[in-house]
Amino acid sequence: VVTLYPSFPLHEDYTKLMGGSVERLAINDKLQIDLTKLIERAAQPAKLLIFANPMNPSGSWLNPEQLRQLFAAKHPETMLVLDEAYHEYAVHGNYTSGLDLTELIPGHWVVLRTFSKSWGLAGLRIGFGVCSSTELCQALDRPRTPFNTNQLAQIAAKAALDHEDYMLH
């Protein structure tokens, strides 16, 4: 699994927990993604390439053109996971969600979002993912334990989505 460093530690922790190995790509001295290094590595096959965009901990992100360059270079056998946990905080500048550019991503991909950050529902442990295909979604759902998201969390997430304008102000 290829990931950026430093970044959200659970990308590495879960990989190791499942017996996988982690390859770290260092971000630059300005705490931004080294696009050249990322594109060079993305062109080579890997089981998974996962990183936060916007970045954790720096808040920097790849702009739409940089995402296009990355997607064009990505090896088609590598699954790409974009962790957009901080998506709602990127309300200024030239941020674009990976969801707006998915037609450009070769092969399998997943975009992750959470209600933990801007929605303030961290204790409820709820989020969602959008997958490149129904088959991938079903494959990812197979090992999920039953009842892993409680009803209160589901009700709170729905209420948050019903009042998105409140969160944005």
Model-flagged regions — what are they?
Residues 16, 33-45, 57-80, 84-118:
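Active-site pre-lysine segment of PLP-dependent enzymes
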Residues 53-56, 150:
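Amphipathic alpha-helical repeat scaffolds
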Residues 108-169:
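PLP-dependent aminotransferase class I/II
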Residues 1-51:
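PLP-dependent aminotransferase-like
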Residues 5, 52-53, 84, 89, ...:
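Glycine-rich, N-terminal phosphate-binding loop of Rossmann-like dinucleotide-binding domains
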